[in-house]
Design a protein with these regions (language model features):
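C-terminal non-catalytic regions of proteins with extracellular/luminal or membrane-system context
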Residues: 1-216
Length: 216
């Protein structure tokens, strides 16, 4: 189990959306309740984005000993917040650098993503599978472990389109606005309406999701 989000989950938004949770589950605390043999748990990276070679080294040493790496990563509280515009759609570089390095010593990586909105995913190839927990609330860790261990059938579907590149989004050419007034020039062509109409390839389409069942 690797990643700062396994210890301090990103389970809600910030600003006026923040609530005082009665009890917050974490991956590190909850995983012992499941039929998983845990080799160890380390943070691996700094949540704030700084490079920490000692944490990275500990993560690599742990990954070598494990059959499967559960890598918890995503956008921190300052990357997306009320009243702040995101200037890009990337996961912090130190997290992705660790993911790439982990893949060199253990290719069996399950990426457990936490973010409140769409992100670029050029790092997808380094994960054997990806579980997106979004902002799962105070009981999000247990819910994700239920999916990972097969206790429940994964049946969630994306409620937004994940583009291949930020430059592919309809607002890219006029965002952020240079004046006090923001112009929503997309009109009705937002989200899947734009990508479908303009025939722009995407990473994952609106409504994408998997389950253990095949329907015909």
């Amino acid at each position: 189990l690797i990643g700062d989000f396994a210890f301090v989950p990103r389970y809600q938004g910030t600003g006026s959306s923040m609530v005082n949770a009665t009890q917050v589950e974490t991956m590190e605390q909850m995983i012992g309740d499941y039929s998983v043999m845990l080799v160890g748990a380390v943070s691996g990276y700094c949540r704030s984005g700084e490079v920490d070679e000692a944490k990275k080294k500990a993560a690599l040493e742990l990954a070598v000993r494990a059959d499967v790496v559960l890598f918890c990563f995503g956008l921190d509280e300052l990357s997306e917040s009320e009243g702040l515009d995101r200037t890009h759609m990337r996961i912090p570089e130190n997290q992705i650098d660790l993911l790439k390095t982990l893949a060199q010593v253990n290719p069996n990586i399950v990426g457990i993503l936490s973010a409140g909105s769409a992100v670029e995913m050029p790092w997808e190839k380094y994960c054997k599978s990806i579980l997106h927990g979004y902002l799962g609330g105070q009981a999000g860790a247990g819910a994700m472990l239920n999916v990972l261990t097969g206790c429940v059938n994964p049946s969630g579907h994306l409620n937004e389109t994940y583009p291949l590149h930020y430059e592919d989004t309809p607002a890219y050419h006029h965002f952020p606005a240079g004046e006090r007034n923001a112009q929503y020039r997309e009109g009705i062509y937002i989200g899947y309406r734009y990508y479908d109409t303009a025939k722009v390839p995407v990473q994952y389409p609106f409504g994408y999701g998997l389950s253990y069942t095949t329907f015909e």
